């Protein structure tokens, strides 16, 4: 069985979540028997091409490829609002694009429902994202190095967010919370992968240039597991997600997680994460030391259900089913 992976991960797009997911899955499949996997390339012979993006380069690949064409729905119309400019215009093309693939892989119950409403005639299978838990694990040396690099004291409480710098990810709430809790250090890892197409691009660039004293914008860093190890609490104030991969990474590193109460997380994280409705609740949760310790103690074990070895096996089973049908 020959499987070709295709994802548009050039330039800053290499930092978007779907590129991370695709590479992790690709590497794990490469360890398995009875399957040959290749990475991108328009001339790579394949029985099945697994797409993780659907931009112009992917469209060209889709037109010239002869094998089965599978797309993972990392992006849906819901997550474009507050994320990129001209979202309403772009969202109109989703049904037409999705119908051009033989099979759709959805990554969460809410993602599955949204795609079903959009293309009810298209066959689809839900397989969640997976992570390499060997890589995403706490390291004391990583913690010290990260804090030293960014001038964070050993006793400082660090609230970490890993996300694109966009309104949809809850950037403005993050800044409001930082102002309300000046005794804590607030670290945001991530950049603007869509460049000038990002929502509120100029405003966010100004904010990044002049952060508050207790706020650190690291931009992209070589290994985000360093940031997870250096933090005490993970916060994701995002208003919409298809899965929430960074939550899973944080849990694997043993962090307690506070996240906005949005439907995308239902059926994925259960009661392992602490949900909030407004900023007042976040402030209160950050002071719940005993509760945060309780969630941290069970975080690593919880993440095992999304170990990449299991997720890769599910993908391989689907590939076989599609090629045999």
Model-found features: residue ranges?
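A charged, aromatic-enriched C-terminal amphipathic alpha-helix characteristic of glycosyltransferases
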Residues: 17-20, 291-324
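A conserved mid-protein helix/loop that constitutes part of the nucleotide-sugar donor-binding site
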Residues: 20, 157-160, 166-180
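Glycosyltransferase donor-sugar binding loop
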Residues: 131, 162, 185-201
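Aromatic "clamp/platform" in nucleotide-sugar-dependent glycosyltransferases that forms part
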Residues: 220, 239
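Short hydrophobic beta-strand element within catalytic cores of glycosyltransferases
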Residues: 256-259
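Conserved acidic donor-binding segment of nucleotide-sugar-dependent glycosyltransferases
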Residues: 270-291
């Amino acid at each position: 069985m020959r499987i070709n992976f295709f994802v548009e991960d050039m330039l800053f797009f290499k930092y978007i979540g779907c590129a991370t997911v695709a590479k992790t899955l690709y590497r794990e499949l490469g360890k398995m028997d009875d399957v040959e996997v290749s990475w991108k390339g328009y001339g790579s012979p394949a029985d099945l091409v697994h797409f993780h993006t659907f931009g112009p380069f992917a469209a060209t690949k889709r037109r010239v490829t002869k094998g089965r064409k599978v797309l993972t729905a990392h992006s849906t119309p819901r997550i474009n609002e507050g994320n990129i400019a001209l979202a309403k215009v772009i969202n109109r093309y989703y049904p037409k694009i999705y119908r051009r693939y033989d099979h759709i892989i959805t990554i969460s119950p809410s993602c599955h429902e949204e795609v079903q409403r959009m293309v009810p005639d298209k066959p689809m299978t839900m397989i969640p994202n997976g992570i390499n838990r060997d890589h995403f694990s706490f390291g004391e040396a990583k913690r010290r190095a990260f804090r030293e690099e960014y001038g964070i004291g050993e006793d400082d409480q660090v609230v970490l967010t890993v996300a694109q710098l966009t309104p949809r990810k809850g950037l403005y709430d993050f800044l409001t919370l930082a102002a309300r809790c000046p005794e804590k250090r607030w670290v945001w890892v991530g950049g603007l992968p869509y460049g000038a197409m990002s929502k509120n691009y100029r405003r966010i660039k100004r904010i990044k240039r002049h952060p508050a004293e207790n706020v650190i914008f690291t931009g992209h860093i070589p290994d985000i597991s360093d940031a997870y190890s250096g933090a005490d609490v993970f916060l994701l104030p995002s208003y919409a997600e298809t899965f929430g991969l960074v939550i899973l990474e944080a849990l694997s590193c043993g962090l307690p997680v506070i996240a906005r109460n949005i439907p995308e997380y239902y059926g994925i994280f259960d009661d392992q994460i602490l949900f909030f409705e407004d900023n007042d609740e976040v402030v209160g949760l950050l002071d719940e030391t005993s509760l945060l310790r309780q969630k941290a103690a069970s975080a690593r074990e919880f993440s095992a259900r999304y170990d990449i070895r299991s997720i890769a096996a599910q993908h391989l089973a689907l590939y076989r089913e599609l090629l045999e049908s």
